[in-house]
A protein has these predicted regions:
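Intrinsically disordered, low-complexity regulatory regions
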Residues: 1-114
Length: 114
C-alpha cells in the first residue's frame, strides 16, 4: 500500500528527477528565524562582554541562570520589552538562559550544581 508521503516523494522525483531521503532527519528549518537571530544576538553580546562560551564556567550556574531567566521573564511580563543594559529583548535573554540550563543538564549529571 502506498502512503501519502510516498506519493509526494514520487511526484517530487518525477518533477525534478532527483531523490533525497531525509524524511527522518532533523529539520532545522523549523526553528523560528526571528527567535534564533535574537538568541544569537544575545550570545554575541555576552561573548563581547565576557568571552565566548563563558557561560560554561559560571559557578553555581544552574541557580544563577534560572534566576536570570526568571528576572528577564518577570521584566517582560511587567511590560519592559528590552533589557536596559543590552537593549535586547528580555525573551531572547530568557531563551539563552534556558539553553544554558539545558546544556548544563545534558553535559553534567542532574545532581551536579555546577
Amino acid at each position: 500500500m502506498t502512503t501519502s508521503e510516498e506519493v509526494v516523494k514520487a511526484s517530487q522525483t518525477a518533477t525534478t528527477g532527483g531523490r533525497k531521503f531525509d524524511g527522518d532527519k532533523l529539520q532545522y528549518g523549523l526553528l523560528p528565524p526571528l527567535a534564533l537571530k535574537a538568541t544569537v544576538e544575545i550570545l554575541t553580546f555576552g561573548a563581547k562582554k565576557y568571552e565566548p562560551d563563558n557561560w560554561k564556567h559560571v559557578p553555581d550556574s544552574k541557580r544563577r541562570y534560572f534566576d536570570a531567566m526568571q528576572r528577564h521573564l518577570w521584566a517582560w511580563k511587567e511590560g519592559e520589552q528590552n533589557d536596559p543594559e543590552s537593549g535586547k529583548n528580555h525573551l531572547a535573554h530568557a531563551l539563552c538562559c534556558l539553553m544554558f540550563l539545558y546544556e548544563h543538564d545534558i553535559m553534567y549529571s542532574v545532581d551536579d550544581n555546577s
